[in-house]
């Protein structure tokens, strides 16, 4: 590949020891590449919706909430998020019974409930059928616009990129970089 996974690993602070990066990563006027992973406050959504199948949908979402949120406010935040995403009443549902689109929504909700300062999207729409993909894509970008957080997205399909976005073609960049070396 051209380094997409390596870039994301570096951004979240999980770069394998056999790799190295130079440069700095800044977010909201703070250098974050020197911070531990947990302090970077970067959410990530993978192409496979990674949920903990031993927990209910609601328990998966409760895991993401900041520790500062206490008592009934935790449950209310999760129920509000489920309702916003069209999954009201799914709190006690087993994640294994969810459709692919529902799992993707729960995974995104979990990333957003953690209150990230930025969001990384790693091919989040690629495994969804065309109709579901369009709806989910619109919903995802509506949610992140409301939160006003930056998004870095990896995709092979330019239809997944909002029209007002900046695009870096890493294949071209990688090709040019290797010519300069």
Tell where the protein language model's regions lie, with residue ranges:
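ABC ATPase NBD coupling module
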Residues: 30-46, 67, 71
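Conserved ABC ATPase "signature" region
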Residues: 72-90, 141-142
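Conserved ABC ATPase signature
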Residues: 94-98, 102
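Hydrophobic anchor residue at the start of the ABC signature
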Residues: 108
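Conserved H-loop
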Residues: 148-154
């Amino acid at each position: 590949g051209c380094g997409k996974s390596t870039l994301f690993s570096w951004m979240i602070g999980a770069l394998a020891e056999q790799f190295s990066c130079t440069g700095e990563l800044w977010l909201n006027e703070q250098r974050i590449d020197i911070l531990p992973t947990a302090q970077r406050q970067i959410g990530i959504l993978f192409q496979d919706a990674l949920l903990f199948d031993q927990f209910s949908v609601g328990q998966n979402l409760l895991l993401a909430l900041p520790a500062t949120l206490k008592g009934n406010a935790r449950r209310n935040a999760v129920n509000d998020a489920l309702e916003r995403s069209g999954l009201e009443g799914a709190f006690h549902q087993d994640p294994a019974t969810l459709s692919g689109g529902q799992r993707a929504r729960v995974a995104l909700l979990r990333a957003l409930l953690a209150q990230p300062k930025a969001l990384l999207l790693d091919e989040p729409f690629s495994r969804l059928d065309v109709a579901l993909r369009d709806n989910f894509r619109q919903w995802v970008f509506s949610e992140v616009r409301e939160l006003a957080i930056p998004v870095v997205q990896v995709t092979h399909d330019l239809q997944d990129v909002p029209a007002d976005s900046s695009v870096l073609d890493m294949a071209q960049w990688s090709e040019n970089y290797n010519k300069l070396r």
